[in-house]
Amino acid sequence: MKIKKFLILALLIILITPGCSITKDSMEDITIYTTIYPIKYLLDSLYGDNATINSIYPSGVDTNDYELSDKKLEEYSKTDLFVFNSLDKDRDYAVKMINKNKNLKVIDVSLGITYVDDITELWLNPYNYLMMAQNTKDGLLEYIDNPYLISNTDGTGIENKYEELKYNLSRLDADYKEDINLATYKTIVVDDDMFKFLEKYNLRVISLEDNDNLTDSTINEVKKLVNNGTIKYIYSSKDETNDVCKNIINNYAI
């Protein structure tokens, strides 16, 4: 009797299993290439459990100066997915890689986004970075069929991860607003236009970046503010600042 029951159960399993088999999604366990860390961070956050994510750039290089060889582009074009920023030189790489592999999947994270002063606004500004996250999420969803990878009760789906990112970036945006609103003096001096995105929070940002926008009037105003003690710091994005800032620092003991 026990043997009969076992045989019946085994037969049922054989009959049922083909109809319930789970097909692995073509986007599982893939290799994704991207460019800079802010984009890689989004990919790691949204899909890092299901893919190997690498940068096309060697570690430690200045991506502004580094140029990829045609041999490297040939290699990267064979990957499963390339995620790039079309507002940067990434776009040229994407075009070359697509020309080498017409089947290459791509996602443009900067779709519909613009910047005013510096490209770093795309990831330093929480609102812009959230748009980048949404573009990354939407791009992944275009290629993925498995509902579990999209959203699940375990909280590991792309939609679940996106909601976490959205919450954290919204908190950061709120912190910016609150901290600047509580500041007694709402003017800062910086050495790079990348900080000017803070103006959206009603903070006056005086940039001493050495470009066509820098005037003698601006430099003289900063000297006056430093001299009378109103400004005590110049915020820098780099270890080495430009000559204009060095001159003010050396002559006014800031």
Task: Label each region the model flagged.
Residues C20-I254:
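Extracytoplasmic metal-acquisition and chelation regions
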Residues I3-T23:
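Sec-dependent N-terminal signal peptides of Gram-positive bacterial secreted proteins and lipoproteins
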